Amino acid sequence: MANGCYAPHGIGGDLMEPRYAVLQKVRNGKRTYGVTPHIPGGFISSKQLIKIAEVAEKYSGILKMTSGQRIAILGLDAEDVPKVWEELGMEPGVKSLNSVKNVHMCPAAFCKRAKQNSLKIGMALDKRYHGMEMPCRTKIGVAGCRNACTSVYARDLGVIGDKEGYMVTAGGSGGFTPRVADIIIDKLTEEQVFLVVDTLMEYYKANGNMGEKLGDFIQRIGLDKFKEDILSKSIY
């Protein structure tokens, strides 16, 4: 389970809310919650899938496939949330508001269109960054070809495979004020991808203002400066 360095109770840090749960509705004074276990890249074993279904049925929850490649259990009573997490035995999908929420991944090696088996990179980024505290909520997208079926250009950070290597993008958003990501560099090797991404994340974490999306940060300091600082500290 997640450690205690994140939001102590509700995802927003509200002491009155159950830990790692999102308030859904208040109807006639009754509050219901949703929980979302972490499923890296949307890949799940049959045993995990059965466990989620069994726990949801036991606590009268409703299952919902999410846009983040996860399965949410909705309609839970507050007192049942801790029991649900204990019985699932899985990491929370979202650990705090301003953190890396997920790493979207395409099927890659399972897709005939893939130019690179980007799953290795996606799983490594998930292991390295999921739940890490950032200036603002952060989403990562990884795709094995330029079709970018994980909406990479709408993610804060993206990695796209191509015949000539990998491309890294940054600053995308599909939220209230959509923004298309900027291409930071292309034709990277797998090793170079990690150098660039690690440098980019550290740079944003150190210099971004609290609550400032990566795209807004890039606009504030300028794309040219952002690219120069990232690339000079990573591969140039």
Question: Could you describe each region identified by the protein language model?
Answer:
Residues 2-16, 221-228, 236:
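Charge-rich, low-complexity segments
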Residues 142-147, 216-224:
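A glycine-rich phosphate-binding loop feature that marks nucleotide/adenosyl-phosphate handling sites
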Residues 2, 144, 153-213, 227:
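Mobile "lid/hinge" segments at catalytic clefts and subdomain interfaces of large enzymes
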Residues 8-9, 35-162:
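Small-residue-enriched alpha-helical segments and adjacent helix-cap loops
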Residues 5-8, 61-67, 134-137, 206-220, ...:
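Flexible, glycine/charged-enriched surface loops at secondary-structure junctions
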Residues 5-33:
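Intrinsically disordered, low-complexity polar/charged tails and linkers
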Residues 23-29, 59-65, 173-174:
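Short, flexible, solvent-exposed loop/turn segments with mixed acidic/basic and small polar residues
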Residues 11, 16, 38, 43-44, ...:
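Conserved active-site/ligand-binding neighborhood in enzyme cores
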